Amino acid sequence: MVTTLIAVIGTLAGTGLAGLLQHRTARTTRDDSRRDAAVQAVAALAAALADHRRAMWVREDLRLTGASPEAYEAARTESHATRSAITAPLTTVSVLAPALAPAATAAAQAAYDLRAAADRTALTTDRDRAMAAADGLVAAAARRFGA
């Protein structure tokens, strides 16, 4: 009788432990998957921000140097496309890593701020500020997700 009772208790304890381990493994897998998605979103956002900075630099440089209306309009169209490409990764970062949302939003705004620079010096300053903000986002992500 005692042997049977010990066997039943051992079986129940083993089943409980197996269930607990399975639950922890599933949770770890979900956390890892979410982390990977957030890191990918930050990388996509950093690339989109770099593309938009480049497009805005070209656009504003053309405006400041008095380029042809056709060249400016082509650059303007490109900058609209690159700005639009920021939306999805910015939203994904904000949803998956809310702690990074302020840095992500600041980096996006800094890229948008290249618009209507007063002169080439201001354009360079704005670009440098946008690059620093994007670097700040990447550094914040590294602190949050780094090994």
From Swiss-Prot:
Residue segments, region Hydrophobic: 1-20
Name of the protein this chain belongs to: Protein KilB
Gene name, Swiss-Prot/TrEMBL: kilB
Keywords for the protein's UniProt record, in alphabetical order: Plasmid
Domain of life: Bacteria
Annotated function: Involved in plasmid transfer.
Lineage, opening ranks: Bacteria, Bacillati, Actinomycetota, Actinomycetes, Kitasatosporales
